[in-house]
Amino acid sequence: MAERESGLGGGAASPPAASPFLGLHIASPPNFRLTHDISLEEFEDEDLSEITDECGISLQCKDTLSLRPPRAGLLSAGSSGSAGSRLQAEMLQMDLIDAAGDTPGAEDDEEEEDDELAAQRPGVGPPKAESNQDPAPRSQGQGPGTGSGDTYRPKRPTTLNLFPQVPRSQDTLNNNSLGKKHSWQDRVSRSSSPLKTGEQTPPHEHICLSDELPPQGSPVPTQDRGTSTDSPCRRSAATQMAPPSGPPATAPGGRGHSHRDRIHYQADVRLEATEEIYLTPVQRPPDPAEPTSTFMPPTESRMSVSSDPDPAAYSVTAGRPHPSISEEDEGFDCLSSPERAEPPGGGWRGSLGEPPPPPRASLSSDTSALSYDSVKYTLVVDEHAQLELVSLRPCFGDYSDESDSATVYDNCASASSPYESAIGEEYEEAPQPRPPTCLSEDSTPDEPDVHFSKKFLNVFMSGRSRSSSAESFGLFSCVINGEEHEQTHRAIFRFVPRHEDELELEVDDPLLVELQAEDYWYEAYNMRTGARGVFPAYYAIEVTKEPEHMAALAKNSDWIDQFRVKFLGSVQVPYHKGNDVLCAAMQKIATTRRLTVHFNPPSSCVLEISVRGVKIGVKADDALEAKGNKCSHFFQLKNISFCGYHPKNNKYFGFITKHPADHRFACHVFVSEDSTKALAESVGRAFQQFYKQFVEYTCPTEDIYLE
């Protein structure tokens, strides 16, 4: 997994071509933009798409980018300087076994390994095949037990299951029972596939996960490759177990490897439960103008995965290609159609409960009995990855308060965005039309109040947006009736009122508890909504306050620096310090804010730097300030672990804070019309005075006389 992440990081994007803040009227030079591009996986936002990106990096189906091991002359001279070659060179150390299989020059080694493994097994003769021989006769295995599926042949391990298992045994890793060994073999043997008779593949055949290119000068079009990570031994065993339906036709010399690949794909359509299974790209129905196109070209065979996994919520968007699933690619399709989704190796829809479509010629017609019970999908995640369960809700429905369907990755990925180069310029394609539900820079203020995922929500303390987990890193304070009050409690659960006197709560809402009744109901003021009411006591917890002696020391100091800035947002980061973490957070927030700047501009605020900490006071209009209560956000200085401005654009400033109770960190990003060097120096001065006062209190130098 670490190698995959390093390989992904190798595709760092180039500097953006335009400013992310097109709606901000800031008197600044034209080069006012982020110029320090950091790979987006250098900090975690705990979103499902990053988990998908880490686990299924080979899902990106693109003819210029292949992250699978090189097969059949993939690394040709024409593609040596491309970005795909560079990425593939870094991904050679992935956790797949036999990464160098099927490369030109490795065919002899593969046959030698087959001979050695066959010699070690009693009763199995060596396969009669040579490096330059057509692989079709290999399906007529001469050894006893190789012509039928009755004899179990152990395979080389491709997953964590290091010991061979007998058929129908229990998979102790995934708690999945293996499927039947003979049913799929019989179906494959009964199929009348043109691939087994030496015919060429259709001209528009779909490119599966590997998206491999044929060698230069080869007349064979790109073949349909399987999704398994089998070793050469397993591939030879799979082809031997499938008896030919007729006399095999010997392919020309230049087509030997391609024909073998087709036979291998035919035999390995159904994978076992112990292998890693990668999802195939999402399909779409052929265009009316292209009745002969059975499958999409490779540049359009891009999978779309949304963080809201409701299959019934998707609808068909005619005439638009499929974007990629990762945030580094430019498109993100939240309108994937279930009719276009096909599992690995067939056009069946057993998961959706629909009748199977007409089968392809290369597959068996007896696919109606297949279901997700026969194939177990394994999700491989990092040990530190966190999955968040979200409810299933329609994509076209109104965005509710707890909606997670409009995540930052939905909004960050717009193909026609000039700032898309900050996410991934190497994967750019032709501009694609955006679905109507995805936000863009064309959004207007009269649109509904769209709420982003709480994993990645920009914090605007003006009450217009939902609270996020980043707000629990500090303390709220409000001026109520001319007197400033600090937050006393924080909501830990959502509470939906059922009576008029009850107070609605969202997670992490700042609360000012005014009365604690004996029946375990609190009467409180919600600083986010400005409403009062009662709620159950166990729906909120008391916030951590600074010690009284430290508060007294801070009150004795009258030094306060104020700076006028614009608050861009907050994002959770994995580390408490580092310029790379700070720049990555600035990059992510700037990209996100660019898409919402028209209907939700950044809030003007005043940063107050003192010995106590950093206070963010929202500077609203006078009319709004007269109507409501003025709120601010406060971060104790002891919880601030790192601060600084962008090394290549000092108009951006950010600081990292630690959660008072949990081991979590968040970065808060601001932008100013002028340089923020003075702001960073002021925070450094506050640190020095705070440390001096803390040392004087804890380690006094006065002589102490005891009577």
Swiss-Prot record:
Tissue expression as described in the entry: Expressed predominantly in the brain and insulin-secreting cells. In the brain, high expression found in the cerebral cortex and hippocampus. Localizes in the synaptic regions of the olfactory bulb, retina, cerebral and cerebellar cortex and hippocampus. Also expressed in a restricted number of axons, including mossy fibers from the hippocampal dentate gyrus, soma, dendrites and axons of cerebellar Purkinje cells. Also expressed in kidney, testis and prostate. Low levels in heart, ovary and small intestine. Isoform JIP-1b is more predominant in the brain than isoform JIP-1a.
Residues recorded with modification Phosphoserine: 14, 28, 39, 148, 177, 183, 189, 191-192, 210, 307, 324, 326, 336, 351, 362, 365, 403, 405, 440, 443, 465, 467-469
Compositional bias segments (type: Low complexity): 13-24, 71-87
Region (Interaction with MAP3K7): 279-467
Cellular compartment(s): Cytoplasm; Cytoplasm, Perinuclear region; Nucleus; Endoplasmic reticulum membrane
InterPro entries: JIP1_scaffold, JIP1_SH3, PH-like_dom_sf, PTB/PI_dom, SH3-like_dom_sf, SH3_domain
Stretches for region Disordered: 1-26, 69-367, 425-447
The name this protein goes by in its record: C-Jun-amino-terminal kinase-interacting protein 1
Induction annotation: Upon neuron differentiation.
Function: The JNK-interacting protein (JIP) group of scaffold proteins selectively mediates JNK signaling by aggregating specific components of the MAPK cascade to form a functional JNK signaling module. Required for JNK activation in response to excitotoxic stress. Cytoplasmic MAPK8IP1 causes inhibition of JNK-regulated activity by retaining JNK in the cytoplasm and thus inhibiting the JNK phosphorylation of c-Jun. May also participate in ApoER2-specific reelin signaling. Directly, or indirectly, regulates GLUT2 gene expression and beta-cell function.
Chain intervals with Acidic residues compositional bias: 105-117
Entry's transmembrane regions: none
Domain SH3, first and last residues per copy: 484-545
UniProt feature, compositional bias: Polar residues: 158-178, 190-200, 219-231, 291-307
Region annotation JNK-binding domain (JBD): where it falls in the sequence: 127-281
Family from the record: Belongs to the JIP scaffold family.
Post-translational events: Phosphorylated by MAPK8, MAPK9 and MAPK10. Phosphorylation on Thr-103 is also necessary for the dissociation and activation of MAP3K12. Phosphorylated by VRK2. Hyperphosphorylated during mitosis following activation of stress-activated and MAP kinases. Ubiquitinated. Two preliminary events are required to prime for ubiquitination; phosphorylation and an increased in intracellular calcium concentration. Then, the calcium influx initiates ubiquitination and degradation by the ubiquitin-proteasome pathway.
One GO biological process term: negative regulation of JUN kinase activity
Gene transcribed to yield this protein: Mapk8ip1
Highest taxon of the lineage: Eukaryota
GO molecular function: JUN kinase binding; kinesin binding; MAP-kinase scaffold activity; mitogen-activated protein kinase kinase binding; mitogen-activated protein kinase kinase kinase binding; protein kinase binding
Motif (D-box 2): 360-368
UniProt short sequence motif D-box 1, positions renumbered to this chain: 349-356
Record carries keyword Transmembrane helix: no
Domain PID: 557-696
